[in-house]
Amino acid sequence: MNYSALLDAISQGPLARWASILPEQIAEGLSEERYGDLPAWKTVLAQLPAITSSHTELAERVSIGAPGDCDETTREQLQSVLEALIPWRKGPYWIHGIHLDTEWRSDWKWDRVLPHLASLKDRLILDVGCGNGYHCWRMLGAGAKRVIGIDPSPRFVVQFHMIKQLAGLHYPVDVLPVGIEDLPEKLHAFDTVFSMGVFYHRRAPMDHLLELKNALRPGGQLVLETLVINGKEGDVLVPEGRYAMMNNVWFLPSCATLLSWLRKMGFKAPRVVDICPTTTEEQRSTHWMRFHSLPEFLHPENPALTAEGHPAPIRAVFVAEV
């Protein structure tokens, strides 16, 4: 997991302040003392077979290579290595004839988001809470100059490096084992910042909005996707216990409430561009994620409610500028 190309690329320019402290942050984020499973995951990564890919498709889907690029024995080895890092949450990926059918149909989310964005061509992009980096690849496929994803989960980081090793190390896309709080204050560097599926996990929502704003250059665009509730301005659900079996869900505002929060934090022209109930077709258990998923998180007698009796998940996409 080599970041030297990234560090060289950002050592000058708007990310130089971050580049100076990033090696230490990466070392801490991939500390084997802190994450006991990391040595085993690194061993698995080293077992990834070397396959020359005949093509890589990123615009319409993430597809690497073709079945004919390797023999069946090599493909079985590849599948075994990929399975060693189950669960795979975000995707799907097509890799040398293997359909990596992840828990989330993250491509559906991308199809909902992309039409509402300023062009990503030649943009420097930050993807906060990016998981294994699926959307980072789609951003690159939409023409981005460089994409940096951040996620503090080392399993997701290793999964990303598996995909990058298969696709090609030359691609200007990286996933770093850090959180947004690790970025230097008032960096004002990125053309577009994405925060998708993160906001409701933040205990201090206004602080998160400020962190996102401080990462953007003047005129840059924020893309915020989060869980919401139906309601008027001022309405917010704060689950006292779990929400859809998750114990780290803090604030689910109405769309009108979150728009007011964005204005409060100084974002310009905040707007809702998509509202979509999460379905059991979009989030479900698969071979690549064999644990409970949305069908088990909903009320067994009323799928309009979570297992705890809260409104079932609705996700909205907000876009704003600074």
Swiss-Prot record:
Coiled coil: none annotated. It comes from the Bacteria. GO terms for biological process: tRNA wobble uridine modification. One of its GO terms (molecular function) is transferase activity, transferring alkyl or aryl (other than methyl) groups. It catalyses: carboxy-S-adenosyl-L-methionine + 5-hydroxyuridine(34) in tRNA = 5-carboxymethoxyuridine(34) in tRNA + S-adenosyl-L-homocysteine + H(+). Carboxy-S-adenosyl-L-methionine binds at K90, W104, K109, G129, D151, P152, S153, I180, E181, M196, Y200, R315. Pfam families: Methyltransf_9. Keywords: Transferase, tRNA processing. InterPro entries: CmoB, Mo5U34_MeTrfas-like, SAM-dependent_MTases_sf. Its EC number is 2.5.1.-. Belongs to the class I-like SAM-binding methyltransferase superfamily. CmoB family. HAMAP family: tRNA_carboxymethyltr_CmoB. PANTHER family: METHYLTRANSFERASE (PTHR43464), TRNA U34 CARBOXYMETHYLTRANSFERASE (PTHR43464:SF95). Homotetramer. Catalyzes carboxymethyl transfer from carboxy-S-adenosyl-L-methionine (Cx-SAM) to 5-hydroxyuridine (ho5U) to form 5-carboxymethoxyuridine (cmo5U) at position 34 in tRNAs. NCBIfam families: PRK15068.1, tRNA 5-methoxyuridine(34)/uridine 5-oxyacetic acid(34) synthase CmoB. This is tRNA U34 carboxymethyltransferase. The lineage of its organism: Bacteria, Pseudomonadati, Pseudomonadota, Gammaproteobacteria, Cellvibrionales.
